[in-house]
Amino acid sequence: MTTIEVRGLTKQYGSDLVVDDLSFSVEPGQVTGFLGPNGAGKSTTMKMILGLAAPTRGSVTVGGRSYRDLPVPLTEVGALLDAGAVHGARTAYNHLLALAVSNGLPRRRVGEVLGRTGLDAVAGRPAGRFSLGMRQRLGIAATLLGDPRILIFDEPVNGLDPEGIRWIRDFMRELAAEGRAVLVSSHLMSEMAQTADHLVVIGRGRLMADTGIAELMHATGNGTVLVRTADPGSFAYHLTAAGGTVRDGLEGSLVISGLSGVEIGKLAAYHGVPLSELTPQRASLEDAFMELTKDSVEYQGVAA
């Protein structure tokens, strides 16, 4: 069952078109990465999913209903948009208790989510004394109070140290393994490559990709082949003549694009060129993202 359904979603502020006819779905049992350059419309889309902003056109449903029609929203969807949105003088326990009581949730859930996020030992400490990583955990604990099947996180690893990033990555994967739908935005491509099962990429408010990570990297190309040979100059000539693009790599190697590893190997055999290395270099998620969104950034540098 689809848990988040976005159809033809459009948001306009005056003459500024922030989200433009956007459609995608988020499925249970997986982490869906929500990616795009700054100003792409990610945060605005999340706000519309959560009923914090009204669409100009289109629709978005959560579990088959609009957010405002959910009788007890926290039991359907939990969201963390700003981990700093907590009273600094209030303890972690009292912060969560206030949320539970005001939403008609059992008090026992406070202790359960504190334990699950590793905050039970500091439950009596004022949130204002928490580190950034602990505040993120407190925000995640709040999203779990209603035991929802849908979870939304906006840039949850921003500013965290490697230990904090790894904890959140593993926790996202754990939540998805329980059959929950997890939608997470991030600008850290290396992190998304390790966390997400599926990607939704937008640029200037429009959908650019709705696919798996491997499929995205394959579709955008950018793969190269690293070659080492005792006679790089001569082989570079043959590679160029065959339609390849050749540039010098490290320590006398050649980096070739436009030809596959199989084609390069056959070319070397035909011309009697012995190769000491032939290694396909797969494009990274960051490479694929940059290629896909290169025409959708708000500003671009100009080479001198």
Language-model features, listed with the residues they occupy:
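Residues that scaffold the ATP/ADP-binding catalytic core of kinase and kinase-like folds
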Residues: L70, L216, A288, L292
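C-terminal coupling/interaction segments
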Residues: S257-A304
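ABC transporter nucleotide-binding domain
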Residues: I168-L259
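Solvent-exposed beta-strand sheet faces enriched in polar/charged residues
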Residues: R7, G63, R228, T279-Q281
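Conserved NTP-handling cores and scaffolds of large molecular machines
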Residues: N103, T220, G243, R282, ...
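ABC transporter nucleotide-binding domains
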Residues: T2-V6, K11-G203, A209
